[in-house]
Curated annotation (Swiss-Prot):
Alphabetical keyword list: Amino-acid biosynthesis, Cytoplasm, Histidine biosynthesis, Lyase
Stated role: IGPS catalyzes the conversion of PRFAR and glutamine to IGP, AICAR and glutamate. The HisF subunit catalyzes the cyclization activity that produces IGP and AICAR from PRFAR using the ammonia provided by the HisH subunit.
Pathway the protein acts in: Amino-acid biosynthesis; L-histidine biosynthesis; L-histidine from 5-phospho-alpha-D-ribose 1-diphosphate: step 5/9
Name of the protein in its database record: Imidazole glycerol phosphate synthase subunit HisF
A single cellular component GO annotation: cytoplasm
Organism: Shewanella sp. (strain MR-4)
Known EC number: 4.3.2.10
Source taxonomy: Bacteria, Pseudomonadati, Pseudomonadota, Gammaproteobacteria, Alteromonadales
Amino acid sequence: MLAKRIVPCLDVKDGCVVKGVQFRNHEIVGDIVPLAARYAAEGADELVFYDITASAHDRVVDKSWVSRVAEQIDIPFCVAGGIKTIGQARELLAFGADKISVNSPALSDPSLISRLQDEFGRQCIVIGIDSFYDAASDSYKVKQFTGDEAATKETAWYTQDWVEEVQKRGCGEIVLNVMNQDGVRGGYDIKQLSLVRQLCDVPLIASGGAGTMAHFRDVFIEAKVDAALAASVFHKAIINIGELKQYLAAEGIAIRQ
């Protein structure tokens, strides 16, 4: 059995790490490099950085802090934000990123996934999906440009269909960002993640809702995800990553120590 992964997420805006609730009202929580170094020292398996306004503002993630992060940590990290071309992806990888993640640009141009996969290999390409549960229709829908409230829009894609589409086009991993749960620390959306798990032949990372150590245990056992991503519980020091891993190991979950 492959060991499960713990992945802190750092949302970046204007050069700082920020955190919102349900993708709104972002507040500054710290500086990029010190937080990255702290999480690496605590035992994070990898890090994910989202430049949350890059796509909405038609720019690409700032490479200067990518290189500074690469100099300071010795664990893999993934970068996302406005990546629309092979050249932009190549630059970020050259500056030290191990993976690149694409979200809104892939919705605008799904062929981007295949082109990136052809150039860099499936293992390097992560697709982020911002999924919103619409109670009126009892369905999961994909949203785009979620880093900017004014630019956010609903797409024509249902989450399950988009999960299948991105796999056909060659993604190596999927991060399912459950918007309804984001930042509220009420637990991961086990129902939705379990549904996506059945459709997902590539590694699946759960995102949105972590509030206690038990929430991590539950998502690994019940939804059978490969990794759990979280932000506010780590930023606010509610959960220490090393202690979380000890807890999960004691619960019988294969986890990297």
